[in-house]
């Protein structure tokens, strides 16, 4: 980890928060990050009698990719999640049991199941601006992914008095709040939920995601 870059980042962050008079207003400081999940997962550890050779554990052979986008503030409040599924048309979303996802979940699609500029801009308008409250200014900390730095998104942030700050490259894993405090517990909860199902597919995934989402967000 580059200590100089880390030091510079925290100086910049403090300056931005101080300039906007929100240094001690954690509800106005947000962090967005994404993680990926496939229907092929690692089973949780199974306790068995010593010497047992074949210990059953539920896994899925499918590997469909879903990108999960989360946003939380420094006070511990969360926004509705965004799920990006793999597909070329809206029909790819309809194949999921979307009603079983957490309340308010936003669904979108992309050929590889990844974030892109248009999805990020839609998320900013339809989730972030509607759920961040009316206080201004605010700060949104991102991981530096190109979709979070599009010109259209930055301009929209300026219009809405939302400062968008990127984490330094190559060391986001060390500094990313969601990586450090949410996605780790989420992964464990997700694998635990999956282990109780015989198969993980487009119909069962939203239920499994909801179980892990609420468990990790309230831990």
Q: Where in the sequence are the language-model features?
A:
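Phosphate-facing sequence motifs and polybasic nucleic-acid/acidic-lipid-binding regions
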Residues: 1-219
